[in-house]
């Protein structure tokens, strides 16, 4: 007689509050882990960008150079540079250690919602309310964009890059994927303004959140709808969503002050994490650990799994 095999342990969710950062930079428009998850950046409505060690709760540096609120940021693969974008229509390339502006890129006709580096950090891509994605060469001194992608009929809300592919979400309701090697573009119409887009960790699936309070998971190659996730509130604001570090769960900010977690396969809402009273605008999942950053009410919160011990890890 054999015993039934034990059920695999359900993956932990980051629901234990570990640290709170009082950012002192107005409303925090975005929080982003760096590439290895040791640091994070916060974008403020007070025009500043800040670099933190969120695991210790310490501020490392403040970056000033934008003329209006900072809306998004990303770090380079080697942590030596950051890029950021702003309502002032500019994109800035920063030297992280020096705290200095390396380049300021101008060309967008309206506020710039999102920025990403390519994997080598030689090109910055930015998406704007002016309906365009612009590609900026970090190494060249030329001021104009090296490429402009202008297929969208309304503002670009979110972009992500994976290898040679760009994923872009637009207020026109289309999820567009650009294959830079083949020079091809595919579009999937989702029917509602898109607020955030993500690749899964294995780059086989696409996640898009929309202002109809629905997240959709699509097969990257076929565009087939694999799952829909509801139960959060997203009618008014540009809110972040993402997949957990092992692609087991879908996460989204919510306008009711929570972050929602769904089982990716089942589609069931498994946790509503209470973060604050106001809308949770931004989140960032650690690249390799059960660890989540959220931004709400001018501060940032760091969450860990329930079994995590401060000394020695989980």
UniProtKB/Swiss-Prot annotation:
Molecular scaffold protein for various multimeric protein complexes. Acts as a module in the assembly of a multicomponent scaffold for the ERK pathway, linking ERK responses to specific agonists. Also involved in response to hypoxia by acting as a negative regulator of HIF1A/HIF-1-alpha. It comes from the Eukaryota. PROSITE patterns: WD_REPEATS_1, WD_REPEATS_2, WD_REPEATS_REGION. Disulfide bonds: none annotated. The lineage of its organism: Eukaryota, Metazoa, Chordata, Craniata, Vertebrata. Pfam families: Beta-prop_DCAF4, WD40. SMART domains: WD40. This is WD repeat domain-containing protein 83. Keywords: Cytoplasm, Repeat, WD repeat. Belongs to the WD repeat MORG1 family. Signal peptide: none annotated. It is found in: Cytoplasm. It comes from Xenopus tropicalis. WD repeats lie at residues 23-62, 65-104, 107-146, 151-188, 189-228, 231-272, 275-313. SUPFAM superfamilies: WD40 repeat-like. InterPro entries: G-protein_beta_WD-40_rep (IPR020472), WD40/YVTN_repeat-like_dom_sf (IPR015943), WD40_repeat_CS (IPR019775), WD40_repeat_dom_sf (IPR036322), WD40_rpt (IPR001680), WD_repeat_MORG1 (IPR051980). One of its GO terms (cellular component) is cytoplasm.
């Amino acid at each position: 007689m054999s015993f039934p095999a034990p059920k695999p342990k359900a993956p932990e969710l980051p629901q234990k509050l570990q640290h709170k950062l009082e950012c002192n930079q107005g409303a925090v428009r975005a929080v982003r882990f760096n590439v290895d998850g040791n640091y994070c950046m916060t974008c403020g409505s007070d025009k500043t960008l800040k670099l933190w060690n969120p695991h210790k709760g310490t501020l490392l540096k403040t970056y000033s150079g934008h003329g209006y609120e900072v809306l998004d940021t990303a770090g380079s693969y080697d942590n030596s540079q950051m890029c950021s974008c702003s309502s002032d229509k500019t994109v800035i390339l920063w030297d992280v250690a020096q705290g200095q502006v390396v380049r300021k890129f101008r060309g967008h006709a309206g506020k710039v919602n999102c920025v990403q580096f390519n994997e080598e950090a030689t090109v910055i891509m930015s998406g704007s309310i002016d309906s365009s994605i612009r590609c900026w060469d970090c190494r060249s001194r030329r001021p104009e964009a090296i490429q402009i992608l202008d297929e969208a009929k309304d503002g670009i809300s979110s972009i992500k890059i994976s290898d040679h592919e760009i994923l872009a979400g637009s207020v026109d309701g289309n999820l567009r994927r650009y294959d830079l090697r083949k020079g091809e573009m595919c579009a999937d119409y989702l029917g509602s303004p898109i607020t955030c887009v993500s690749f899964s960790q294995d780059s086989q699936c696409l996640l898009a959140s929309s202002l109809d309070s629905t997240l959709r998971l699509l097969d990257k190659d076929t565009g087939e709808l694999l799952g829909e996730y509801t139960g959060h509130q997203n009618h008014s604001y540009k809110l972040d969503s993402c997949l957990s570090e092992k692609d087991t769960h879908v996460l989204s900010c919510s306008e009711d002050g929570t972050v929602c977690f769904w089982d990716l396969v089942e589609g069931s809402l498994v946790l509503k994490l209470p973060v604050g009273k106001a809308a949770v605008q931004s989140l960032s999942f650690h690249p390799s650990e059960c660890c989540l950053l959220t931004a709400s009410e001018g501060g940032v919160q760091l969450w860990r799994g329930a079994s995590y011990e401060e000394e020695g890890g989980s």
